[in-house]
Every structure is written in structure tokens, then in C-alpha cells.
Amino acid sequence: RAYAPVLASPYSAGEGKVAVKVVSDRMERFEGELEAYVMGLDGKVMKKMTAGCKVEANSGADFIEIDGADLEGDAFLYVRLTEDGELISENTFFTRYPNRYDWGEPAIDIEVSETTDCYELTLSTDRIARCTYLYTDNENDCFEDNYIDLIPGFPRKVAVRSNMTYDNFNTTLKYQT
């Protein structure tokens, strides 16, 4: 999320390199773990890198650098930043325009569970599902996040506040990729 206080941000660093910067708007030092995956659209991990991150207050620093040649073809970069084991930022990086990729048709699985104050969706996919839009027929439903990228091998949880019954919610829940 662009407005989060700490972000993992991959960018083109020139000379055929891609770097991952961790940027913190916090007023205290940040420490976390950065993971970077070079993946195929089918979810195959071709390369994994990790780095411990220590970022001073209100600043940023580069932690991982990748050779752009690793991102040729239908490969992309997926980065995850955790703090005390909790995911606080994730991002993707593509080296080409979207219409240059063979995205294929993802098979998306959605499990719905009921909590005391909302429904919790657990979404997974067999291949990358870019720009997945989640919605229901009820305009009053409030999705924590309804426009997401789904990455194979990394299930995504989304909370939804709804006044519908569990059965009605399940039958009206839809997605579009």
C-alpha cells in the first residue's frame, strides 16, 4: 500500500540492475526481513534472496540488487517485507509492459470463514493473477482491499465487513482478473 509507513520498493537501478529499497516514514529505527523472489508467471521460484534490514528513522536504503537478465522472458520480481514475522509490505516489479506477458488464465481458490465482526477471505492461485478485483452484489460491503495481485504460493487474506448472511455472501462474492 502506497500510504504504509514502511515500504519495500523495487526499482530500475540502471546498468541492467533492479534494486529493492526499504523506505521508512517512522520516527524510530526500523528492523525487518526482506525477501525477494524471481518468479515465473506460473509461480516457479527461479531465485530467492533475503536480507536483514535496518533503516534509520525517516529514511530509506537499498538492500537487494538483482541482475536484470534474471527478469527476462515472463519472469517478474516479488518482494515481501516482514517485521517480527508479520508481513508489512509486498510489491511486484515487471520489466516489460503488461501486454508483453502471456498471463494465462489463473485458477483462483477462495475460502470464506466467518469471524465475530467480518468475513475473512483466503485467496490462492496457481499462477499470478494481476489486478484481481473482488466484489459482491451488495454495495454496502466493505473490503479491506478489493484490488490485489495474487502470487502463487503466497495465500492472501482479505477481511470484508458485510451485513449479508454467510450463504448470501458466498453466493454473491465475485472476482475479475
Where are these regions (language model features)?
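Short, surface-exposed ligand- or partner-binding patches at beta-edge/loop junctions that are enriched
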Residues: 71-82, 163-177
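Carbohydrate-binding surfaces of carbohydrate-active enzymes
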Residues: 1-145, 150-159
